[in-house]
Swiss-Prot record:
Assigned keywords, A-Z: ATP-binding, Cytoplasm, Kinase, Nucleotide-binding, Transferase
Subcellular location: Cytoplasm
Binding positions for ATP per the UniProt entry: A25, P26, A27, G28, A29, G30, K31, T32
Signal peptide interval: none
EC assignment: 2.7.4.8
Name listed for the protein in its UniProt record: Guanylate kinase
First-level EC class: transferase
UniProt xrefs under NCBIfam families: guanyl_kin
Gene that encodes it: gmk
PANTHER family membership: GUANYLATE KINASE, GUANYLATE KINASE-RELATED
Reaction it catalyzes: GMP + ATP = GDP + ADP
Family recorded in the similarity comment: Belongs to the guanylate kinase family.
Pfam families xref list: Guanylate_kin
Guanylate kinase-like domain mapped to chain residues: 18-196
Length: 204
C-alpha cells in the first residue's frame, strides 16, 4: 500500500484545509510566470514548493527559490532515506519533491503549489489528494518559438524538449483542469478562478 499523507488544519483559517495543487506544462508554456503572478497576488494563501534537482541553475535562477540545487550524491542519499514523495529522472538529471517541503507549507496555513512534470504530478496524486492543472501552449510552433526566445538550450536540447512536450501534451486528459495559455492575462484569470473555487470547496 502506498503511503498516504493527511492534511493538517490551519489554526488561523479553521474552515480551510490546506490543499496541494500541481501545475504541469511543457517547457515554455508559461507555468512559472503564472504561478509567480498568483503567489504575488495571494502571498498569504499560496506558496510554491521548492523541488530539489541535480541540474545546474540557469542564469536567472536562485537556490532555495526556484530549486534546491544539489549534487547527485546528496539527491540519491535523500532518495534512499524516503524523503521524496515523487521523483523523476529527466534529460539526464534528477528532480524530486520533498514531503517535508509540503508539510512545512501546510503547517503555515497555506496551500502548496508544486510546479512539476506530468509524471510527478500523477505520482503525487496517487499519494495525496491533489488538484491537478495542466498549462498548454496554443501550438507546438508557439512552444518552439518560446523555447528559442528563452535561449537556455542548444538546438539538440530544444528538440528533445519539444519531443517530450508532445508526450506531456498527450497526458493532459488525465488532469482535472487544462488551460491553453494563448493570452497571459486571460490565462491568469482562469487559473485564479480555479484556485479560489477550490479553496472554497467543501471537504465531504
Amino acid at each position: 500500500m502506498k503511503d498516504k499523507v493527511s492534511f493538517p488544519f490551519s489554526p488561523d483559517r479553521p474552515l480551510c484545509v490546506p490543499k496541494l495543487f500541481t501545475i504541469s506544462a511543457p517547457a515554455g508554456a508559461g507555468k512559472t510566470t503564472l504561478v509567480r503572478m498568483l503567489a504575488e497576488e495571494f502571498p498569504d494563501s499560496f506558496q510554491k514548493t521548492v523541488s530539489l534537482t541535480t541540474r545546474s541553475p540557469r542564469p536567472e535562477e536562485v537556490h532555495g527559490v526556484d530549486y534546491y540545487f544539489v549534487s547527485q550524491e546528496e539527491f540519491l542519499k535523500r532518495l534512499d532515506s524516503g524523503d521524496f514523495l515523487e521523483w523523476v529522472a529527466l534529460f539526464g538529471e534528477y528532480y524530486g519533491t520533498s514531503r517535508l517541503e509540503i508539510d512545512k507549507i501546510w503547517k503555515s496555513g497555506k496551500h502548496a503549489i508544486a510546479v512539476i512534470d506530468v509524471e510527478g504530478a500523477l505520482a503525487l496524486r496517487s499519494k495525496i489528494p491533489t488538484v491537478t492543472i495542466f498549462i498548454s501552449a496554443p501550438s507546438l510552433e508557439e512552444l518552439e518559438r518560446r523555447l528559442k526566445h528563452r535561449g537556455s538550450e542548444q538546438d539538440a536540447q530544444r528538440q528533445e524538449r519539444l519531443q517530450h512536450s508532445l508526450i506531456e501534451q498527450a497526458a493532459s486528459s488525465k488532469f482535472e483542469y487544462v488551460i491553453i495559455n494563448d493570452d497571459l492575462e486571460k490565462s491568469y484569470e482562469i487559473l485564479k478562478s480555479i484556485f479560489i473555487a477550490e479553496e472554497h470547496r467543501n471537504v465531504l
